From Swiss-Prot:
The lineage of its organism: Eukaryota, Fungi, Dikarya, Ascomycota, Saccharomycotina. The keyword Cell cycle does not apply. SUPFAM superfamilies: S-adenosyl-L-methionine-dependent methyltransferases. It comes from Candida albicans (strain WO-1). The gene is TRM5. This is tRNA (guanine(37)-N(1))-methyltransferase. Gene3D superfamilies: Met-10+ protein-like domains, Vaccinia Virus protein VP39. Monomer. Its main location: mitochondrion.
Amino acid sequence: MSKFSPPINRNMVELDRSFFYKEVPLLAAYFPNPKFLGQFVKSCQNDILYVQTVKHIISMDDSKAILLRDDVKSISDLNPETQLKINEFGIILKPYTLKLDYSFWKSEEILKSILPENLIDDVPSGFSQAGHLAHINLRDEYKPFGKLIGQVILDKNPSVLTVVDKVNTIANKFRTFPLELLAGEPNYIVEQSESGCKFKFDFSKVYWNSRLSTEHERIIGKFNPGDVVGDVFGGVGPFAIPASKKNVIVLANDLNPESYKYLQENIKINKVEPFIKPFNLDGREFIRKAPELLLQWHNSQNGIIEKIIIKKVSIDDNKTKKIFERKPIIETTKIPKFYHHFVMNLPDSALTFLDEFIGLYGSNPQLKTDPEFKLPIIHVHCFEKFENNENPTPEELHNRVYEKICKLIQFPLNKKKVEFHEVRMVSPTKPMFCVSFELPEEVAFKQTK
């Protein structure tokens, strides 16, 4: 064990920070004349103490000193060149006691010193963070030590004020889980920044996953200003609000009343009211009604969204030095009567909703006569879990998902035009994909009862 390892107490029930005090005896090279410090450091690197967060140059007796390697007991333990420099510079070796306390060690090091020995190989010191709240997923064997783990995480991360764990892994229909407060304040109202937007929500009542921020931005990057997007399982707006900031027209839906409430609040916080309409419907109902909801919005605005922006405008072009003033300008965006994209970020079950797109425009066949008409791109997130004894290739997993989609929409998609993107590995046997494909005309305009 290193001299710089924390003390060990595997019987600790409540965190005792005072237990983590340690004195490390060292030798210091004291410089009566500190002008030689730089030369010594340059020439004697191998004999200097380099430990993360420990400053090897210290103040001592009205001058400076350099801490030497922790295994140095006398001058004879130093390299010959270092011994020469000590004599040349008139350096004096003096004993020095390095005092370490709880603040010195990282959370993982602290936890490895207090958890049972059979649990130290995979210490749960990592977490996802939303605002001031840290969310950890403790495996069953670590749950008895949850309070200890939570307190250490709280102590070691200044931006964290609340630490929670899932009570179980079974989500309700709103994708939320019962939470246990492990440490800190029982405050679940968080404020989170993502994609240049601000989000406010109750972490205990809505779905939010900070690990998906890259995926949010990837999908948003596919939208163009003036596109219409249907966000079927929109949550508090991680897709919808950043998209609407770039003048994308979004109809955002979520079944959870709490998500709907915070979606409305986040729309106001980010001042994107002109470009987004929130809905609190079941996903199937939202898809069925999507064309009608868009048409209602189109008609209520006479087909135009007006947005007031402030621009610098030149008010005198005749003078050598131009004079500008800030003026409100009305920027207009045409509202199409059709969708360019649908986002379905509900990986547990989104695939099962795809059959609702059959006949999406079946009652409005004249829509395809619009010279600007485009069929929507569906972006559906899904898991494709496999057994521990399997070793499927990415192509095999893609085929499994592809076959499910074709069966659900009752149409053989051209697989070459289907995009598969692996979002992340939730577990070693549970990849999360986003599959993007254009809804075929035969499906979109199919006549249904």
